[in-house]
Structures are given as C-alpha cells and as structure tokens.
C-alpha cells in the first residue's frame, strides 16, 4: 500500500456542502488522501459519521476545544473563529496524531489533479514549510493588494513534524489567537513575513 497523503480541513454546517465536494474531489485526485476534519458543529460530525468514509477521520468540536478557545469563541464570529482554529488544527494533527507531514486545505477548494505534486516539490527542495503565494503582479496595484490581503494565500499550506516547522506553526497559532479578524484577513496576514525564513 502507498504512503498516505495527510490533509486537514475544518468547516461548519454552512460549508458542509462545499466540504463534501472538496473532499470527494481530493480523494478522486489523490487516492492516498487521508483527511482529518475538525467538525465545527454537531451537524458536520453527524453527517460525516454517517458518511463513514475510510479516507476521513473526524475530530469533534468538544475534543478539540480548550478553555482558551471557548473564551475566544464567545468574542468572534463564525468565520473569524474558524480562522482562529486553522493553525492549531495542523499542530494537533502533527503532535497528537503523530503524522510526519500535514497539508491544510480550505473547505471550498476543488481538486482537478493530485496536489501531492506540490508537497513532493517541497520535499525535493528539503523544505519543512510550504505556503502558496498570491503572486500579485509587481506593480503599484499588486503591491497594494499584497498589503491589503497579505502575500500568501493560506488555502493550501504544508507543515512537517520537525522543530523549525512546529515553531513557525506555533507562532502562527499564537498570532491567530491574539487577533483574527477582517483587518488581518483572518489567519492570512500573519504569514506575510514567512519569506524571511529559509527551511
């Protein structure tokens, strides 16, 4: 059997249809896909439990939460709270489930081909973290977009279970817990300085 390709995602009932389509497209594109799903409410957990797909491992909301997150949840909207949880979800997959590598994917993506080509490129270059840049044009307008939306798009990013990767992941997690709003483009703006790291 081939080595599994580990992914994680999160969504609530408002994104359930998109999440199901994303996961179906991912499994069709990468038959080794194994997806950890943080179920942001019981509707998602119940649906995925009934779905009973061997490519999916559910993480219940109650299993994931702690006192800090419960307190933050009261202060943030649904979208902001989902953004808050992204970095921690990746860390949980790496540390609790002992996966060697994990790629976070947004629930509203659709895969037409195997995304492991990106992960394989990362491995080939001996990198431990991969984030996808927006690739705004090097123009006045492009630079303005980078300032407004951040340099990177966090819809698909990969971390290995290595110390420098975990350190950056923890830094991202702390930033998201401190503030995660439209002003920071959710969890996205915090990744803009990642280009200065080389590992």
Language model feature labels by segment:
Residues 1-199:
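Glycosyltransferase catalytic domains, chiefly GT-A lineage
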């Amino acid at each position: 059997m081939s080595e599994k390709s580990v992914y994680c995602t999160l969504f609530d009932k408002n994104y359930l249809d998109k999440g199901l389509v994303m996961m179906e497209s991912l499994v069709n594109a990468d038959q080794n896909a194994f997806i950890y799903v943080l179920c942001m409410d019981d509707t998602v957990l119940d649906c995925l439990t009934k779905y009973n797909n061997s490519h999916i491992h559910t993480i219940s909301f109650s299993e994931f939460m702690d006192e800090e997150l419960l307190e933050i949840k009261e202060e943030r909207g649904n979208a902001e709270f989902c953004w808050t949880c992204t970095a921690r979800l990746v860390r949980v997959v790496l540390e609790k489930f002992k996966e060697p590598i994990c790629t976070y994917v947004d629930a509203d993506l659709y895969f037409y081909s195997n995304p492991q080509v990106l992960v394989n490129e990362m491995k080939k270059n001996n990198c431990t973290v991969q984030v996808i840049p927006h690739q705004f044009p090097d123009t006045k307008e492009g630079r303005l977009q980078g300032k407004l939306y951040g340099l990177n798009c966090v819809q698909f990013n990969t971390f290995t279970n290595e110390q420098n990767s975990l350190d950056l992941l923890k830094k991202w997690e702390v930033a998201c817990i401190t503030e995660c709003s439209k002003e920071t483009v959710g969890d996205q703006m915090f990744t803009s300085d990642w280009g200065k790291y080389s590992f």
